[in-house]
UniProtKB/Swiss-Prot annotation:
The keyword Mitochondrion does not apply. The lineage of its organism: Eukaryota, Metazoa, Chordata, Craniata, Vertebrata. Homopentamer. Forms a complex with GCH1 where a GCH1 homodecamer is sandwiched by two GFRP homopentamers. Interacts with GCH1. This is GTP cyclohydrolase 1 feedback regulatory protein. Signal peptide: none annotated. Keywords: Cytoplasm, Membrane, Nucleus. It holds the Pfam family GFRP. It comes from Bos taurus. It comes from the Eukaryota. The gene is GCHFR.
Length: 84
């Protein structure tokens, strides 16, 4: 799985940061210290960490991921990363 999306609600100085969904690499989610949750009303699960995005991006960079793009959608910030 070379692509990864992470997101956070505005304020990006604090967590939580969403780092994956139910199809994400379990080993990578464990490395990030992510917990799996299901939000009431959603029919899917997501992995999140309490770290701010900067900490998550630093951890992912050390694992070989690079940011391809970043955007804001409403009050959500999203980063797309890729690993060669």
């Amino acid at each position: 799985m070379p692509y990864l999306l992470i997101s956070t609600q505005i304020r990006m100085e604090v967590g939580p940061t969403v780092v994956g969904d139910e199809h994400s690499d379990p080993e990578l989610m464990q490395h990030l210290g992510a917990s799996k949750r299901s939000v009431l009303g959603n029919n899917f699960s997501e992995y999140y960490v309490n770290d701010p995005p900067r900490i998550v991006l630093d951890k992912l960079e050390r694992r070989g991921f690079r940011v391809l793009s970043m955007t804001g959608v409403g009050q959500t910030l999203v980063w797309c990363l890729h690993k060669e």
